Amino acid sequence: MLKNKFIYGLIGKEIDYSFSRKYFNQKFKNEGLINNSYENFDCKNLSQAIKVLKQKNLKGLNVTIPYKEKIIPYLDTISKEAKDIMAVNTISFNNQGKLIGHNTDCHGFQKSLFENINKKTKNALILGTGGASKAIRYVLKENSIKYQTVSRKKNKGDFIYTELDRDIMSNFELIINTTPLGTYPNTEKCPDINFDHITKDHILFDLIYNPIKTSFLNNGKIKGAKIANGYNMLIYQAEKSWSIWNEIN
């Protein structure tokens, strides 16, 4: 039996699709970290998720929907970014056994975003107002990029989809999809925008990474827009989680 086995894992619901388990277990193999393993903790409800926090040999956890916000009251403290965003996607354990919540989505998005835009980008349109949009709004605000949001319901966003005419769309260089529309296996789905209003002056960013090119991105590319998916964001947030778990600056 291996000594000092360290367990990492992902807390979420219906997470068979998980990128994280495959990514980290391959990382452990590549780096010869034979005492490390990364597991999926598929929790049907919050009480199951809380039980995971008490397991032995846990070195670090990631958290995904629907527990990014619900898990917060059960942690001992959270980082400034997590507090501002009010969502946690990474949990570390200090030497005293305290549970500390972090948000590495903001790090991943910021690093990936600035690979795809220039410093002149000043206006963004965010499709979706759910939990996934929280870290996005935080990053845009921190970088002085003005944004407005689109929702299916008027009272939740600045616009509803039917209001997005050519004049409105021309005001935003950057359009970010934070909805799950287009995620595998429902790849034919797409946010309800008129792609005739998309031009070569637009940048379309989709948080989805599977498939690599969603209907949203494909329709944008046809109109000449620059496109980017969420894969690099995922890599960057995962590596940030790893550095937090191992206290790497």
Where are each of the predicted segments found?
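N-terminal Rossmann-fold NAD(P) dinucleotide-binding loop
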Residues: 133-134, 213
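Rossmann-like adenosine-cofactor binding region
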Residues: 157-228
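Phosphate/diphosphate ligand-binding glycine-rich loop within oxidoreductases
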Residues: 2-116, 219
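Glycine-rich Rossmann-fold phosphate-binding loop(s) that bind the pyrophosphate
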Residues: 13, 128-130
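Active-site capping/gating segments
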Residues: 111-112, 226-248
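NAD(P)-binding Rossmann-fold cofactor-contacting core
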Residues: 142-159
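Short helix-loop-beta connector
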Residues: 117-123, 198-200
